[in-house]
């Protein structure tokens, strides 16, 4: 258990940051899911539109330290390849 005031504050801050990061990751997953759903349905226009929305969302996740840049690049590359194959 944290005893010092600083350690208690760090716990509070960590909890707040974890909540924000969880929300950001959830948002990224939702955008990626939209692309995957459109690809599964074979709707190229919807897939391209969803991909255009998902890319900046992943970039924001990278900028804010939620996901690693290589992870975002890999996900975007794979999504792009799947959309292009339609």
UniProtKB/Swiss-Prot annotation:
An annotated GO BP: translation
Gene Ontology CC entries for this record: small ribosomal subunit
Keywords, alphabetical: Ribonucleoprotein, Ribosomal protein, RNA-binding, rRNA-binding
InterPro entries assigned: Ribosomal_bS20, Ribosomal_bS20_sf
Function: Binds directly to 16S ribosomal RNA.
NCBIfam families in the record: S20 (TIGR00029)
Gene Ontology MF: a single term: structural constituent of ribosome
PANTHER family noted in UniProt: 30S RIBOSOMAL PROTEIN S20, SMALL RIBOSOMAL SUBUNIT PROTEIN BS20C
Statement: the UniProt record of this protein carries the keyword rRNA-binding: yes
Transcription as UniProt keyword: no
Protein name: Small ribosomal subunit protein bS20
Gene name, Swiss-Prot/TrEMBL: rpsT
Organism of provenance: Erythrobacter litoralis (strain HTCC2594)
Record-linked SUPFAM superfamilies: Ribosomal protein S20 (SSF46992)
Family: Belongs to the bacterial ribosomal protein bS20 family.
């Amino acid at each position: 258990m944290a005893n010092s005031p600083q350690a208690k504050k760090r716990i509070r801050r960590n909890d707040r940051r974890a909540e924000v990061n969880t929300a950001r990751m959830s948002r990224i997953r939702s955008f990626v899911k939209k692309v995957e759903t459109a690809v599964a349905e074979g709707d190229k226009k919807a897939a391209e539109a969803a991909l255009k929305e998902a890319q900046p969302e992943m970039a924001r996740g990278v900028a804010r330290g939620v996901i690693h840049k290589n992870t975002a690049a890999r996900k975007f590359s794979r999504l792009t390849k799947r959309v292009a194959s339609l």
